[in-house]
């Protein structure tokens, strides 16, 4: 998908001049399976949006265990590891499959946000959606049983269980891989 189509259909920018300006700063990037978009602690140099493929956000806990924070699967999903675009990343973002992202150099993205309120509205909308998704996840993790969490995952991320390592799914759902395996067997 080319940048102009993305900013017309996926993340709509109504004003044609502004859309052309943002599209001209954007480039489609290919990530190999296993490649990192950003690592925890690094400052992002690009503002990226998922076009195709699967991304995983994760961090290491105090024991060095890999904890899956989020999955990116939908076209248009921002691949943003922190709310402040100029802050060090709080998570690493890794491609779990061959992946395409649309990227804008961070300096240009920040400049555009500083000078055009229309883009601030779009950014605020993306932040709201992200907050809603993270609060939904937090509610699911802390108010539902392991089986209910797994069923929520299957509904929210259809088909993803067959595309990613089950260890990542178990971590995301705050359960052991053994528990996830038992739940999968129970639903067969």
Protein language model features and the residues they cover:
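Cyclic nucleotide-binding regulatory module and flanking cytosolic helices
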Residues: 1-27, 82-83
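Short beta-strand segments in beta-sandwich/barrel cores
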Residues: 27, 36, 54-59, 100-101
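Glycine- and acidic-residue-biased ligand/ion/polar-headgroup-sensing regions
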Residues: 34, 45-57, 74-75
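Short phosphate-coordinating micro-motif centered on Lys-Gly-acidic
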Residues: 37-42
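Residues that scaffold the ATP/ADP-binding catalytic core of kinase and kinase-like folds
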Residues: 58, 80-81, 112, 153, ...
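Cyclic-nucleotide recognition modules
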Residues: 68-125
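Short, Lys/Arg-enriched N-terminal segment that forms or immediately precedes the first helix
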Residues: 129-140
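Phosphate-/nucleic-acid-contacting segments
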Residues: 144-188
């Amino acid at each position: 998908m080319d940048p102009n189509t993305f900013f017309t259909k996926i993340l709509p920018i109504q004003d044609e001049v502004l859309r052309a300006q943002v599209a001209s700063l954007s480039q489609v990037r290919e990530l190999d399976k296993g490649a990192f978009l950003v690592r925890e602690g690094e400052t992002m140099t690009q503002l990226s949006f998922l076009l195709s493929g699967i991304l995983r956000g994760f961090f290491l806990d105090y024991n060095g265990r890999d904890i899956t924070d989020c999955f990116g699967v939908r076209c248009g999903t921002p691949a943003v590891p922190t709310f402040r675009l100029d802050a060090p990343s709080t998570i690493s973002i890794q491609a779990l499959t061959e992946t395409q992202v649309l990227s804008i150099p961070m300096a240009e993205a920040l400049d555009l946000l500083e000078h055009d309120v229309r883009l601030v509205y779009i950014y605020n909308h993306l932040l709201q959606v992200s907050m809603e998704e993270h609060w939904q996840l937090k509610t699911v993790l802390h108010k539902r049983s392991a089986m209910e969490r797994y069923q929520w995952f299957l509904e929210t991320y259809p088909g993803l269980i067959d595309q990613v390592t089950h260890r990542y799914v178990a971590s995301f759902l705050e359960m052991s891989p053994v528990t996830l395996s038992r739940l999968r067997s129970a639903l067969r």
